[in-house]
A protein has these predicted regions:
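Nudix hydrolase/Nudix homology domain
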Residues: 1-139, 152, 195-199, 263-313
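Active-site-adjacent beta-strand/loop module that shapes the phosphate/pyrophosphate-binding cleft
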Residues: 80-83, 88, 237-260
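Residues immediately within or flanking Cys/His clusters that coordinate Zn2+
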Residues: 139, 146, 156-157
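Conserved hydrophobic/aromatic pocket- or pore-lining residues that grip, position, or stack substrates
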Residues: 142, 176, 249
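Short cysteine-rich loop/turn motifs with clustered Cys
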Residues: 142-145, 253
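N-terminal strand-loop-strand
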Residues: 151-201, 205, 227-228, 232, ...
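The catalytic Nudix box helix
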Residues: 201-235, 249
Length: 313
C-alpha cells in the first residue's frame, strides 16, 4: 500500500466556528480516518487519532462522518470521512508511516479506552466510523433470505436482487444510575466476570416487545432486586459493540431495601456517597486506584461525572 504524498497529523487543526459554503469553500479539505475490518485505527503517542490527507489506494470503501442534517452554514472547512481497509493493509500502512518523526501505531485498545477527555470530537468520529463499518463492510447479505445485498450507489442502502432493502441494525440498550431517594448515594455493581474491585452502572439490552422504560426497570430489578420508583432520562451514546445505542436513565429506588442479585450476573453491589465516588475516581487518575471505575470513554463515566458536578465535586 503506497502512502506517497500522504501526510499524517497528530492534532486537530484550528477550525472556524462556522464556515459558509460558497464557491470558494465548496471544495473543502478532506481528512480520512482509516479503520480496519476488525475496527482498529491509527493513533499517536498521546492516544488521539491520526488522519490521512488522502485515502489509501487499497481501500474497501469510504463514508462521510458528518451528521446527515448538518446545515450548510454549520459546515467546517474540513470534511471528515472514514475509509475502510483490510487488517493487513492497516498494519502495512502503520509500518510505512511509523518512520515519520511523529510516529503512529495501530490501536490495540480501540474504541473501548479512547481518551474522550482529550479528544471528544475524535471519539465521536471513531464511534460513528465503527457503527457505519458494520453496515458497509459486514452486512453483505439479507438476514432473511441469504441473498447478496450490495450497496445501491444511488440510494446508499443495501438491496438484494429481488428488491429487499437491508437496513442497518441498531440494538438498543439501557443503562441505569441507581440513586437513593434523598439523592445522597448511588449504587454501582461488580459483574461476576470482572476483577472484584471493578464497579460500574447497571446496563443491558432491550428485549423484544419492551419499551425503554420497561427495559431499564427490568434490568434494575433483575440485577439488584430493587423496584424503580422514578425514571429520569439523562443522555444517550453510541456504543458500537456490536451496534448498540445506549440510552441512560437515573433510577430512584428505596435504598433501605436489601440488594439481591436475581439473575446471577452480578457478584456484588455497593452504595457510594459523592465524596467516596469522587475519591475513587481521583485515585484512578493518579494511577493508584483501589477501585476501578468506568473509564473516561464510557457514557457511564459521564453519568457519574454529571452527578458529582451537581454535588460540587
Amino acid at each position: 500500500m503506497s502512502t506517497q504524498n500522504k501526510k499524517l497529523s497528530a492534532h486537530e487543526p484550528q477550525q472556524p466556528a462556522h464556515t459558509t459554503v460558497t464557491d470558494e469553500t465548496a471544495s473543502r479539505r478532506t481528512r480520512y480516518l482509516v479503520v480496519s475490518r476488525s475496527g482498529d485505527t491509527l493513533v499517536g503517542a498521546d492516544g488521539t487519532l491520526h488522519y490521512l490527507d488522502s485515502p489509501p489506494e487499497d481501500s474497501l470503501t469510504d463514508v462521510s462522518l458528518e451528521p446527515k442534517l448538518m446545515k450548510p452554514e454549520a459546515r467546517h472547512a474540513i470534511e471528515y470521512r472514514a475509509v475502510y481497509v483490510e487488517d493487513a493493509d492497516l498494519a502495512a500502512l502503520t509500518q510505512e508511516l511509523g518512520a515519520l518523526p511523529e510516529g503512529c501505531r495501530v490501536s490495540t485498545a480501540g474504541f473501548w479506552f479512547y481518551p474522550v477527555h482529550a479528544d471528544p470530537a475524535g471519539r465521536a468520529r471513531y464511534g460513528a466510523a465503527l457503527a457505519k463499518r458494520d453496515y458497509l463492510i459486514e452486512m453483505a447479505y439479507s438476514a432473511y433470505t441469504g441473498e447478496s445485498a450490495p450497496v445501491d450507489p444511488h440510494k446508499g442502502i443495501r438491496l438484494t436482487g429481488s428488491g429487499e432493502m437491508v437496513f442497518p441494525r441498531i440494538e438498543p440498550a439501557v443503562m441505569a444510575l441507581i440513586m437513593s431517594e434523598d439523592n445522597s448515594r448511588v449504587l454501582l455493581a461488580n459483574n461476576r466476570l470482572w476483577p472484584r474491585n471493578r464497579f460500574a452502572l447497571i446496563a443491558g439490552f432491550v428485549d423484544p416487545g419492551e419499551n425503554l422504560e420497561q427495559a431499564v426497570t427490568r434490568e434494575v430489578y433483575e440485577e439488584t432486586g430493587l423496584d424503580a420508583l422514578r425514571l429520569d432520562y439523562r443522555m444517550s451514546d453510541i456504543w458500537p459493540f456490536p451496534r448498540s445505542l445506549m440510552v441512560c436513565y437515573r433510577v430512584t429506588v428505596d435504598a433501605s431495601q436489601p440488594v439481591t442479585h436475581l439473575d446471577g450476573e452480578i457478584h456484588s453491589a455497593r452504595w457510594f456517597t459523592a465524596p467516596e465516588l469522587a475519591q475513587a475516581i481521583a485515585e484512578q487518575r493518579t494511577g493508584e486506584p483501589k477501585l476501578e471505575m468506568p473509564g473516561t470513554n464510557a457514557v457511564a463515566r459521564r453519568m457519574l461525572d454529571e452527578w458529582l458536578q451537581e454535588k460540587g465535586l
